[in-house]
Amino acid sequence: MMRSTLSLLQKCRLPNNNGSLLSFKNNQVVNQTALFSMKSNQQYRFYSTDVKDLAPLIKELRNRTSAPLKDCKEALIQNKNDIEKATSWLHEKGKSTANKFADRAVVEGTISIVVNNGKAVILEMNSETDFVSRGETFRALADQISRATLESNLLAQSLAEIKPDTIAPQPASGSTVADLIVGTVAKLRENIRLRRVHAIDASNQPNTIVAGYAHDPSGTNQFGRLGSLVQLQYEGGQPDIAALNQLARNIAVHIVGVGPSYVSIESVPKVLLDEAIANKRHPNSLYDEVVLLEQKYISGEDNETVKAAVQRISKQLKTNITIKSFVRYSVGEGMEKKVENYGAEVMEKINKAK
């Protein structure tokens, strides 16, 4: 029976699942991608006839694009194992997916901070949900962009804002920042936006200290919903650099915790002071709220201000310390967040049903 069936099949050309034809040679079914042997014991065995192993290509494509394994495999199959065409195919697929989520509100997210050898970057990256923003994939993207920025030529000698769309391509993968975001959107199925970036390069500036802090319950100090960078300068003497670094870090923590807006009284806009006076508010009350140097220092002694603490530590270290600048980020600040009132929604439905 087996022989007669095989004889009949050998006279036929059968279509396979992808529409190409199967032919027979030496009792075997043959096509471009697979064959199976028909044994007398009626066992069927499938073999790959594709000489090129996909595993190394999939690995390379994953490194380039961070796309899921199944997407990398599909891209290679669709493009006949051409790695460049497969990369372009995945980028186009990612853009198509990202466009579907582009109009969704992004008010959650994370603050990422990287400080290394006198250089520092702080950025805010937003997502739709807090769940995604706390995930490893989202934070890895924020870290990757932070470090790409740190190694770029966009950093100034003073703390300054950088436009997100000017950040250089990520050298390790050859992808732009936009490509990295698109790939992650396709993977997480949520809209993602790089909202803002500040950075400084003080690596060649003498007597300058930079520090950063992100408030994270897990204790990483790199990611959180609040973060800050601060720049200090010192003049004279040979102070303990470790002590200066600790002071800068403590001030960065204070900035995150208390939330000042300006370094000194002199930097407060006149319009803000006029508004306080018009509202019969004492200027000192305003300064306590918005001026860093006038605030009670959270790491200080005997209820001292930040200014008093800096003066005290300057004397201890026999140098003159100045807070030059700082920046503070809070996730979603200034953005309108939709608040769901499910109770009101239920009552509205009940009233409509009456």
Swiss-Prot record:
One of its GO terms (biological process) is mitochondrial translational elongation. Keywords: Elongation factor, Mitochondrion, Protein biosynthesis, Transit peptide. GO terms for molecular function: translation elongation factor activity. The keyword Cell division does not apply. It is found in: Mitochondrion. PROSITE patterns: EF_TS_2 (PS01127). GO terms for cellular component: mitochondrion. Signal peptide: none annotated. It comes from the Eukaryota. Residues 1-47 form a transit peptide. NCBIfam families: tsf. Belongs to the EF-Ts family. Associates with the EF-Tu.GDP complex and induces the exchange of GDP to GTP. It remains bound to the aminoacyl-tRNA.EF-Tu.GTP complex up to the GTP hydrolysis stage on the ribosome. This is Elongation factor Ts, mitochondrial. The lineage of its organism: Eukaryota, Amoebozoa, Evosea, Eumycetozoa, Dictyostelia. The gene is tsfm.
